[in-house]
A protein has these predicted regions:
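Generic hydrophobic/aromatic pocket-lining and core-packing "Φ" positions
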Residues: 15, 43, 68-69, 125, ...
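Conserved, mostly hydrophobic/aromatic
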Residues: 18, 80, 138, 161, ...
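Structural motif
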Residues: 20-22, 74-75, 133, 192-193
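Glycine-rich phosphate-binding active-site loops on the catalytic face of alpha/beta enzymes
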Residues: 23-35, 81-89, 142-148, 193-216
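Conserved anion-binding
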Residues: 30-34, 47-177
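C-terminal helical cap(s) of enzyme catalytic domains, especially alpha/beta-barrels
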Residues: 41-42, 46-50, 93-102, 201-232
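A C-terminal functional module that forms or caps the active site or interfaces directly
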Residues: 166-194, 205
Length: 232
């Protein structure tokens, strides 16, 4: 679906910057409480600046499927990323049933590498598949506390343990790495983990929600080079 995604884009200029630098996908954040969360007017403006051929990915946590569909249609999203907690009874949780209800859409599931590895992710994916749904991609992000608010679900700069991820058995779904990636470490992260793609937000920012042109270009160049080398 994509190899390099720049997430948490909040302005049309940053969307154009990422696309021109070679990003395959742009992430638009709709998670309540996030500093990068977009209202509908801003989301439409950002989406309109994304050229054809670059995926517009909507990032959600805890939203019901009707709300996700409404926003996807209004903004013109190409794919949906469920970024909420895997388990829990309250808060920003995205249960397998949400994935099943959106099975006709391009779906991405963000999971977190915990102390027990990807055990919770495997349970969630098995339940989703039993309900007739299967994400096209899994994004592995850094661990967050159970029932953490939207501000702590992503874009925090926290890193995944790359060596621990490399030891995990395959999920049967392509994995994209997120969590604390920046221009200086993305090539090493790809080399160690063997992932098929990478995703960053805070790692290419000058301030929360504002992308740094130099960092964006450097990150995308380094990521594409490392991914090309890996598959050569």
């Amino acid at each position: 679906m994509f190899r390099v995604k720049i997430c948490g884009v909040t302005t049309p200029d940053d969307a154009r910057l990422a696309a021109e630098a070679g990003a395959d996908a742009i992430g638009l954040n709709f998670v309540p409480g996030s500093v990068r969360c977009l209202n509908m007017e801003a989301a439409r403006s950002v989406a309109a600046a994304v050229p054809a051929g670059v995926l517009k990915v909507g990032v959600f946590a805890g939203a019901d499927q009707a709300e996700i569909r409404r926003i996807a249609t209004a903004v013109g999203l190409d794919a949906i990323q469920l970024h909420g907690h895997l388990e829990g009874v309250a808060g920003l949780v995205d249960p397998p049933a949400t994935c099943a209800a959106l099975a006709d859409m391009q779906l991405i599931r963000a999971v977190r590498l915990e102390a027990d590895g990807l055990a919770a992710a495997r349970r969630w994916l098995a339940a989703a598949e039993a309900a007739g749904a299967r994400p096209a991609l899994v994004i592995v992000d850094a661990s967050t506390p159970r029932n953490a608010p939207g501000s702590a679900l992503g874009g925090t700069g926290a890193k995944v343990d790359w060596a621990a991820l490399a030891r995990e058995a395959p999920l049967g779904i392509p994995i994209v790495l997120a969590g604390g990636l920046d221009p200086d470490n993305v090539a090493e992260a790809i080399r160690i983990t063997g992932v098929i793609g990478v995703d960053t937000a805070s790692g290419v920012e000058s301030a929360p929600g504002r992308k740094d042109p130099h960092k964006v270009r450097a990150f995308i160049t380094a990521a594409h080079h490392a991914l090309d080398t890996q598959t050569a």
